[in-house]
Amino acid sequence: KSEMNKQKFFPIDLIIVNFYPFEKTLINSKRREKIIENIDIGGPAMVRSAAKNFKNVTIITNKDDYKKFIDELERNNGKTTLKFREIMSSKAFGLTSYYDSVIADWFNKNLKIKFPEKKTIYGKKFQNLRYGENPHQKSSIYVSDLNNDDMGLKKISGKDLSYNNYNDIFSGLDILSSIKKVPTTVIIKHANPCGVSSNKSPVISFKNAFVSDPISAFGGVVSCNFKINKSIANEINKTFFEVILATDFDINALKILKRKKNLRIIKISNSKKTDTPTIKLFDRGFLLQDKDNIVFNKKDLKFVTKSKPTKKEIKEIEFAMNVCKFVKS
């Protein structure tokens, strides 16, 4: 400080920093050297020091805050308030924490370390939701897949998705990922399958899934690993559903489905299975385990009875085993 006074330097009261694009590099490059080169060192150090000194310094780390910063200056005679600086400081520490977590996760995956000594859960806010599982609970959804900013889902029509919608959607997608490439329909209610069917005919696949439990299916979420056509759309519209997901929809199907204005119509843009671990949170910590990605195969069956099942029965056993692991009691 004495040297600054001697040189008649003004104190720095504004820092604006953009980090090296580590995430983008991870997505676009497999070269280890290039990835490591894009680990920012000076940027995070500068941001942390400025954020710690929020009493005197404004730190901006997100371009979405540039306009807020300008508005703040205009409202306060060219200055920022302590509250604004503290909010920006909070965002800055959130960014450095997120940035370091992505880097640590990359190292752990490369070193095949599944259960590191220190573990952080990270993500980018995708959307604020109207409420959580119940109306009195506040909620947001976060994206942690670097390759899918839209979570692999493209909304075509309908209301915004709710907390319960998302919970049911990803439960359905998990089941679809365990089924072979036969046209399959999954109907989910309260994160539980109430109807699952595979058939060479997509329309029969939907009908069979629905008749499994038509009462529970009411107000559920339908997930299909095939393109929805006019005939399937007509069947769907006979019942009230919250959400319809499919790999695609033809023009005539969309015209029919859009008659129900509140129906959420979602195109599955990416259903690739990931090795993301399963996390269960509780008050004092969380449980972490490998995701149960094993697909049951009839080759794993051992028959210990004299009477052997038929080929049809074996096929049904295989199907049932791949579905029942998703049922929650």
What are these regions (language model features)?
Residues 13-17, 99-101, 109-329:
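ATP-dependent carboxylate/acyl-activation modules
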Residues 1-111, 226, 280, 288:
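Active-site loop-to-helix "anion-binding N-cap" substructures in soluble metabolic enzymes
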